[in-house]
Amino acid sequence: LNVQKILMISITPYNYIIFAILIFFHKKINGFVILRSDGFKEYGAKFGFFGEKIYEILYKKILKKLKPIVVTNKISNLKDYDYHKISPSEITDEWKKNFKKPNLKKANLLYIGRIRKEKGVYSLLKLITDFSIKYKLSIVGQKKKNFFIDKNIKFYNETSSIKKIISFYDSNNIFILPSYTEGYPKVILESLSRLRPVIVFNEISHVKKNLKGIFISQRNANDLQKTIGYILKNYSKIQSQIRKNKILSRKKFQNDLIKLIK
């Protein structure tokens, strides 16, 4: 019987169903599963204790057959498995052209991503209502009518247009990633590629790695305001540091992945 080789992109109930069907028909399966974030924490944030247990079942069954490819070793229960580590990137030459000078008169904050509990967006919205500084927050994701009414907060529909995404970074001066759990978020590389500093909270401090231009804040309004103030005051110096980053390209990432799964 032929061995069915597969590459699974993340562990989800839907992917597990396809996985189970393949096992039923092919019996012998091997390959890889890419883990971009800590599913245990994500399912726990969304569904509580039972969410973690459901994910644990899927995790153990899939990793019996597939070898994990991870973007960070900060994944729960990973120590029990042999794994490969890669650094994903979507950065092309387009990201490194026509830089725009930021407006620093006030904090123009940006978040790009899903509007979900585990992404920390609701937490961020609560924090900024206590701000004493002038700010504007742009959220690019699923647009929801009457989601949050505030003159300083604007919602935009998600987009796959690189040109539009770049314009969002260029029209703001700080990117905030408020997630409770992350692996290797591509938005960090995008923001740094456009010379825009990034703020994350202490729960995902590991994403900083050796990258310059990433700042870690406690999850409270006072510390976040202090971090924003420091960035705006030292913006030119921070941009000079960001330029020293060696950001992996999408081409390099794709070549590394192809070599790994061959």
Where on the chain are the PLM-derived regions?
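A conserved mid-protein helix/loop that constitutes part of the nucleotide-sugar donor-binding site
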Residues: 107, 111-130, 139
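Aromatic "clamp/platform" in nucleotide-sugar-dependent glycosyltransferases that forms part
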Residues: 180
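Short alpha-helical donor nucleotide-sugar binding micro-motif in glycosyltransferases
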Residues: 167-172
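Conserved acidic donor-binding segment of nucleotide-sugar-dependent glycosyltransferases
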Residues: 202, 213-222, 230-235
